[in-house]
Amino acid sequence: MDRERQKKAPIYEALEAFKKKRVVPFDVPGHKRGRGNPELVQLLGEKCVSLDVNSMKPLDNLCHPVSVIREAEELAAEAFGAASAYLMVGGTTSAVQSMILSVVKAGDKIILPRNVHKSVINALVLCGGIPIYVNPEMNQKLGISLGMQVEKVKQAIEDNPDAVAVFVKIGRASCRERV
C-alpha cells in the first residue's frame, strides 16, 4: 500500500477546489450553501454547508464515477486490501441490499447468521432468496453474539453446495477464529 497516496482525499479536495471557484448555486440543495438557512449553518457549521453541493462534472457522479469518486473508491480498495470498493449513500441498509440483490435471485440460497439485520431479510423478500441460517456463538456471561464459527459455516456450505453466497457480518474485535 502506498502510504503517501493514502493521505489523499480526492472528493474533499475537489469540493474545496469547487468552493474556491465561487460558483453561484441555482440547483439543489435549497439552503444555498447556508445562505438560505442560518439555523442549518448554526447546527452543522459553515464548513459543512459550504461544501454541500449537487453532483456535477467537476465533482464526479456516484452512479458512474470517472474521476474523484473513482479515485476515492480505488484508495478505499487499496486501504482495505480489496479488489474494489464502492462508496454508498443511504447507509448500511442500501449497501447490504445492493450486495444481496446483485447476487441472489429468486430461489437462490444464501448462507447467513441467524441474527442478521432486517435489511438482509428485506433484501431476501425483494429478491425471493432462501436463507440458510447459521446460529452465531453467544457469550453467555455478556449476552452478546460472537459471530459464526468457521466450522459451522463450512458445514452449511457442505450441506448447501448450491448456495450462491455467504453473508458475513463481523465486528473488528471478533475476527479471530471467526468468519
Task: Show the residue positions of the predicted features.
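Gly/Ser/Thr-rich loops at beta-strand to alpha-helix junctions
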Residues: 69, 90-95, 116-118, 171-174
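Conserved beta-loop-alpha segment that forms the PLP phosphate-binding cup at the N-terminus of a helix
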Residues: 84-108, 123
